[in-house]
């Protein structure tokens, strides 16, 4: 398997170089400015957290990515799919309310929130999974499939049910 470069930064801030500026620098170092985003719909895939939860990437990081995409001519939007479990992201209306409550609004991030698999989580496209032995297909939210590009803005975390999450 081929490996990809992995870029890291620390959380220390210095005068004139805050976290958002560091993220922008990382994105440029990774070659984001070499991607053709001109007039393309760009999904920024992330999760907006549950109500009362703080274990998600802050909206200002999403804004940094969205601003760079717009600078490069793209049309960014934030997206995620509804959850299978009962919570504040089980259907699109509560999911969007949760996103806004947790700070992910068009006013704070500079782009819209679109729930990728629609109102009830049934707006999906079945796609083949190459080389899969047990799950030959996967259902993907239609908005993700309709996007011209997808940027995955994720974090890694321990999860009660699976041992890890947030990086899927």
Model regions: which residues?
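N-terminal and secondary-structure boundary signal
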Residues: 1-168
């Amino acid at each position: 398997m081929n490996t990809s470069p992995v870029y890291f930064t620390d959380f220390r801030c210095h005068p004139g170089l805050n976290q958002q500026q560091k993220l922008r620098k990382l994105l440029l170092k990774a070659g984001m400015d070499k991607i053709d985003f001109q007039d393309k719909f760009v999904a920024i895939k992330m999760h907006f957290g549950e109500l009362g939860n703080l274990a998600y990437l802050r909206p200002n990081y999403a804004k940094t990515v969205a601003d760079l995409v717009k600078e490069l001519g793209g049309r960014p939007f934030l997206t995620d799919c509804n959850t299978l479990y009962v919570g504040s992201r089980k259907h699109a209306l509560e999911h969007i309310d949760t996103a806004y409550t947790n700070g992910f609004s068009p006013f704070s991030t500079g782009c819209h929130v679109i729930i990728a698999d629609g109102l009830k989580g049934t707006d999906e496209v079945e796609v083949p999974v190459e080389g899969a032995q047990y799950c030959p297909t996967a259902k993907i939210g239609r908005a993700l499939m309709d996007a011209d590009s997808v940027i995955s803005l994720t974090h890694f975390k321990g999860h009660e049910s699976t041992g890890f999450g947030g990086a899927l």
